[in-house]
Amino acid sequence: MKRLHLQFLLLLPVFCLAQIPRIEISNGKGGYKNSDQVILQKLQIETKIVGKISTNTITMVLKNNSGRLREGRVTFPLPEGISASGYALDINGKLRNAVPVEKEKAKEVYETIKKRNVDPGVLEKVEGNNFRTTVYPIAPNGGERTLQITYHDELKKSGNVYQYFLPLNYTQQIPEFIIKTTVFQSTETPILEEKPDGEYNFVQKGNVWTAETHKTDYKPEKNLNINFPQREGSQNILMQQASGDFSYFLANLNMLPNERAKKLPNQIAVLWDNSLSGKNRDHAKEFILLDEYFKANTNVTVKTYFISNTFDKGKTFKITDGNWNELKSYLSKVYYDGGTDFGELKSLQEDEIFFFTDGISSFGEMKMIWNKPTYTISSSNTANFNQLKYISNKTNGEFLNLNENDPKKIVRKLLFQPLKFLGIENDPSVSEVYPSIPETISQDFVLTGILNGNQTTLKVKFGYGNEVTETRVITLNAQEQAVKDWEISAFWAQKKLNELEIFSKQNKDEIKNLSRQFGLVSSNMSLMVLENVEDYVRYDITPPLELKTQFDAIVKNNRTAKEARLKDLMEQAEIMTENLKAWWKKEYTPKPKRYPTPTSVSRSDTARENDLEEVVVTGVSAERTSAVAELRREQRQMSLKDMTYVASNAPQALQGRVAGIQIGTRSESESSSAIINPGRITTIEVESKAEYMKLFSRANDPGTIYGIYLQNRKEYENLPRYYFDVAQLLFKNNDKKLGLKVLSAIADLDLENEELYKLLAYKLKQAEVYDKELFAAQKVLEWRPFDPQSYRDVALAFEDNGNYQAALDNLYKVLTQSYTKELADRDNGIEEIIIMEINQLIANHRSKLNLNTINPKIMADLPVNIRIVINWNKDDTDIDLWVTDPNNERCYYSNKETEIGGRLSDDFTRGFGPEQFLLKKALKGKYKIQTNFFGERQVGIAGPTAIMAEIYINYATGKQERKIVVFQNQKENGRNEDGILIGEFEF
């Protein structure tokens, strides 16, 4: 069954703490559409506030009104500096809390359990400050699923009040709507500036204030806006006692956002992110910011630069008397296309740099090559806040978040030198104080840390640049300032996590440790819910508290075996190497062509013919009927791995005398040059049959093609296939630069999508853009380190880039990694492909390789005339490789060994491939290469399955040639009985 995806996007505008989701379902073609088949049946928002902090819990009930099972995907951004700290999913009608699990392990367990048609729940952090979960199954005909997400946040200061703001401008009725807000330890009445309806009012009980409303069939149209007045200079300190004599503290200092004058620049660089994702920024806010800036800095030279998959210089403008109309018009007409590659950034020499971007480099790694003050400016809901802060901190600039701040106010960061937190005076009784690096004071300031002991006095320093101009004194008292039922430690952990994630790769282990202890979702840790307690035992995952007793009892009594992992593939690889060597030594000679026999022959001739027939060593008949090709899928031959080849000396006496297959053995010292056979590869372009291709039918030059593409892109902007097909047209018309721009835009379509990045890697390999092929492959490996194909793709990309040692190391990892039983079964036989590729590297680049760690039992000289490998970008997909030789014999899954020695690897029916065809010595004539799409079990944002075929002649001989074919499946449903012709050999 093809899985249909839902996507729920929670968009958070200014001061937003949550937002009602927009619900969409897959259109079956890689995009999404609005639908009333799945609705938000219930929305419950519960917020608890104490001091300047809040804990927010959002509960959603999704109802499936369709007649089919649905799989939901919820993707939502959270405000700057905030991470999800709680996740729960209903199991058998009851919410079960998630537990922290390493991100890669959570994915692996998810993939493994999914093979049993039981889906766990996983909440993970993807690129930027975005969080994603999947809900499956949602039963048909009114089935419901409940999920709950919790996060902690700090109230924002606006003027002399702290503000809690919740937008509730939903466009459709919600069958059940509940909102409840509780304010603790407040002596003053919270002020309702705006409320959803007349019933929502605060009621006081002691020093606790509560307001709530419960509606049915309700369409909320008014927002919730609560103000909390504050006195200037006041302090609010909350503490939570911990083990030993330690306490966590959170001190909120009510600061004035002071500033002092600075010399305004004479020249500025406006660096404008014009990648495809750039169109999603709020350009109106960006223009308001610039308008306010030029009102103050009225005479300045502005040089424009653009970053997408390339770095481009724009025009230069002279701003006079604050008139920036020309610049505004110029920026308003920018078109957005291509991926985002911060690795392309060039050195800029202007006094200051204004960098307008979301901070997500989707097509290359960040390289810092300038030291001029850089002001990173974000107006997008989806942004990599840590990347943006890193750039601004590194260059002594500032980060401006237009999405959560008024551009007219935050412009002062560009015009003045702001007051900054500069640290604390050394105090041995406090540790792990955050922030630990200088931080600009916007409206207020929060300091967190750990106190050892009962009390201390802490001196906090503020100033400009490196100059301390003000010191605040705060008193910490664990007895007097302790609060019950508030996780102050979670706020501390969040602050620490924010700093660690600025350098997430270097701090990977510490991020995991912190997330594991405090249940935070991070770039390295996810939150996971499993269906039954046995799975927690099996996969060695500590369960939530409600299952701990049952979990411990099972472990104690050893009633459930822990997951049986396959330690590595080395033993199978050794067996397969011997198998390949035996096959390689076996000599195949095709049956000579038989001519009509005369009817009048002598008796002796007949006898002689009969004598010969008695000793024929028969192979597979060359006259195969079409019935072979029509065998049912269920008829499987024994895996080549399980066959035994016997090289006998006896048949050698028949050499040259027997009709049929002649068998011999090859000398171990036979040179690779003896295998070289001059041949020709012809690849066939698989043309797209998409309806939009008619738009380009008369376009015969790159400029026209690109213009048509931009003109019609809005209609197809979420279809990767559209970019893929147009890029192919541009490559075909010899415009590699434009083709790469269109192709790279695929990277901006979704967050952490391995299917899209595999598609990119395939096409980049074909286009010989090897550095970007490596980047895409490494991203997939980062997201899916449990797939052997991830290491293989990275290895082959390293080889394309000339890094043969890294290629060898990553291929070898495929054989030395451990795998779950389910994934090992899925990829059974992959070692055959890996062995050929390891030995090809050794054969062609031995002098450049360190082989000390390579098992000699898998090393063998195995040159061949023909090698073909196909793989594809989707899991749970079955693509077949067919090769038809000059004798018209087809080698495929039901005929894995041919008369002339063709050999096909194991048939991969549930994973990403690969499948491989080998032929040691090519028979003279033409060979036909086809692929057959047998089936896929899901269609997501990536669209139809992408297939890559690597076609070699004289492989591992030192004279090998390669051609690449990449295409997307053209058949939307079912099997293509005729196959797709992708190439031919001729020898």
Go through the PLM ranges and name each one.
Residues 86-91, 97-125, 134-139, 146-271, ...:
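An acidic, Ser/Thr-enriched
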Residues 592-678:
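Short, small/polar-rich motifs associated with maturation and membrane association
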Residues 357-402, 406-413:
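VWA/integrin I-like adhesion module and closely mimicked acidic/polar interface patches used
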Residues 261-356, 360-362, 383-384:
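Von Willebrand factor
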Residues 18-51, 116:
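N-terminal, polar/Ser/Thr-rich
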Residues 369-371, 684-688, 716-723, 736, ...:
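Generic helix N-cap/helix-start motif at coil->alpha-helix transitions
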Residues 841-987:
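Intrinsic-disorder/low-complexity signal
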